[in-house]
Amino acid sequence: MNKFSKFCLELSSLSDIKPSIFLSPASGYRARCEFGISKNSYTMVEDGKRIYMDVSKIPHHSIQKIMPKLLKYINESSILKSKLFQINFRSSGSDVLATMIYHKKLKNEWSIEAKVIQAKFKNLSIIGRSKNQKITNDKENVKRICKYKNSSL
């Protein structure tokens, strides 16, 4: 007996509710994701091996759309590229937050360069992080408005 069948059996003694299974989409299902940065590419680790990529099918479509363009701008900027080792993406559906994590203290020139790159996207906010340091040029979170019975939540 699998977990779902066992759960249904246990629930049946408490309620008449019949649970259903809904499959997740095969791509674009992650609103949060983390990528390493190495050799001008995003990286992930699979089976102990580093995989290099420009885009991934796992994140939400809004993140997928931004990934290759942002990577291109990062690789063209020595200020943004220097000592960058990780990027975390968050998405609310349309808006995307990219947190760029560094192995060095960030200077004012980083903030200026990040603003220039951020201005090229209508739905991207960039945060810079380093040890004991956080630089925010715009929003530092993403919000999602959900509709329920003609009300916004």
What are the functions of these language-model segments?
Residues 1-153:
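Accessory RNA-recognition modules of RNA-modification enzymes
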